[in-house]
Amino acid sequence: MTLRIGIIGTGAIGTDHARRINRVLSGAEVTAVTDVNRDNAEACVAGVAPGAQILGSAEEVIAASDAVLVCSWGAAHEAQVLAAIAAGKPCFCEKPLATEAYGARRIVEAEEAMGRRLVQVGFMRRYDRGYVALKETVRTRLGPPLMIHAAHRNPTVPGRYRTPMAIHDTLIHEIDVLRWLLDDEYVSAQVIFPRATRHTHAGLRDPQIVLLETAKGVRIDVEIFVNCRYGYDIQCEVVGEEGTARLPEPTAIPTRLGAVFGQPILMDWKDRFIDSYDVELQDFLKAAAQGTAAGPSAWDGYVAAITADVCAQAQERPGAILPVTLPARPALYA
C-alpha cells in the first residue's frame, strides 16, 4: 500500500519534505498540497510533486490524504494538527507544535481523547547519527551524567530575528534533544547575557547563555550565539562520573594546504542535519502505515513549549532562576 500524503504549507521545508517523500523514501507519495501562497504550492507541484493536486484549505488536504505533514506558519500549527487528530489521520508537525504551551496542551488532550498516538513532532536531532551515538555512550560508558556544555551557533540571522526567537526558534532544539539525551526532566531555567557582539541588531541581545537544571541534578549550560559569523556550529559535551563524551563533528575532508591543517565548517543548518530528516520522515511513514505515530510525541512538544516559555520569561529577568513545572505525564506517553 502506498500512503497518500498531504502537505500543508509548501515553503522551503514543506517542498523539501515533498521531494524527500517522492524521491528518497519509500511507501508514500505526495498526493495533495495547500499553501496560503498558491505560487508556492504550484512551484512544489511543478518541481517535486507532479502527481499532487492543489487544494484550497488544510481541511481539504486532511480529508484527501491518509496522513499529513504540517509545515505551515507556526501560528497555524495548532488548529491544523487538531483537525488531523479529529479526522483520525497521522500527522507530522514541524516545530513548534503550538506557539504557546496551552495550545500544545490542547493537542495532547485531543490525542488522549482519541486513545492513540497520531502526532510526531519534527525534532529531527533525535535521528542524527551523532546524537544517537552520544546517547548510547552516555547510557553505557560515562556513569551518571553530571554536566552538559552545549552551544548553538549560527553565522547570522535576519533583522526580523528578535531576542525571544533565540528561545522559541533556536534553543527549542536543545531543549528537546538534551532532555531526550539524559532521559530526564527540567526543573529550573536561568538566562544571562554576556557582552553583546557588535554584529547584532536592534531588538536582539546576542549572545545568550541559558542555564538549565534537571530533576536528577544535572547542570546544563547552552550558549546561543546567532551572529557568530564563522559558520553553523552545534556543540555538545556530556561530563559523567567516569569521563566525558562529545557530539562528533560532521564528516568533512581534512586538508593540509599552504602550511595549514584544517577542515571546512558548514554554513547552513539544512546541510548539518540533512540525513536525519530522511530518517525521521521514514519513521513517520512506517508508523502512519499502521495508523499511528512514532518518534517525538505531542507530549514532547508540550514539554518543550512549557520549558521554552519559562526560558523566555527568564530573558526578561536576567540572572533569576525560574521553576519549570510539568504536569504528570499521561499514560498514553509512558
UniProtKB/Swiss-Prot annotation:
Organism superkingdom: Bacteria
EC number: 1.1.1.18
One function term, GO molecular function aspect: inositol 2-dehydrogenase (NAD+) activity
Reaction(s) this enzyme catalyzes, per UniProt: myo-inositol + NAD(+) = scyllo-inosose + NADH + H(+)
Enzyme class of the recorded protein, top EC level: oxidoreductase
Subunit and interaction comment: Homotetramer.
Family (UniProt): Belongs to the Gfo/Idh/MocA family.
Name the UniProt record assigns to this protein: Inositol 2-dehydrogenase
Lineage: Bacteria, Pseudomonadati, Pseudomonadota, Alphaproteobacteria, Rhodobacterales
Recorded name of the encoding gene: iolG
